[in-house]
C-alpha cells in the first residue's frame, strides 16, 4: 500500500522559477537545496547559507527531492547543460 506524502513547505507556482518546485513563500527552488546537499552540506549548514529558510523547510525540500528524484535530477542536469552551452557560446565571441 502506497501512502501519498504531503510536502507542507513546497509549492509550484506559475511565474516563479518556471513553475518548478520552490520553498513555499520564497523563490528558493528545491534544486538549490539539493545542490548544496550534493556538495556535502548538512541541513544545518544549508540554513547558514540560506538563512531565510528554517530547518523544517530544508528537510521538506530534501524529502520532496527523494519523492521526485527523477524530476529534480533532470532539472539540475538540464540547467547544467544550458549553462555549459552559454559559456561555450560566450567563449567564441
What are these regions (language model features)?
Residues 1-5, 91-93:
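Intrinsically disordered, low-complexity and often Lys/Arg-enriched segments
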Residues 25:
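Anion-recognition interface
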Residues 29-93:
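Long, charge-rich, low-complexity alpha-helical segments
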Residues 7-22:
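Short, Lys/Arg-enriched N-terminal segment that forms or immediately precedes the first helix
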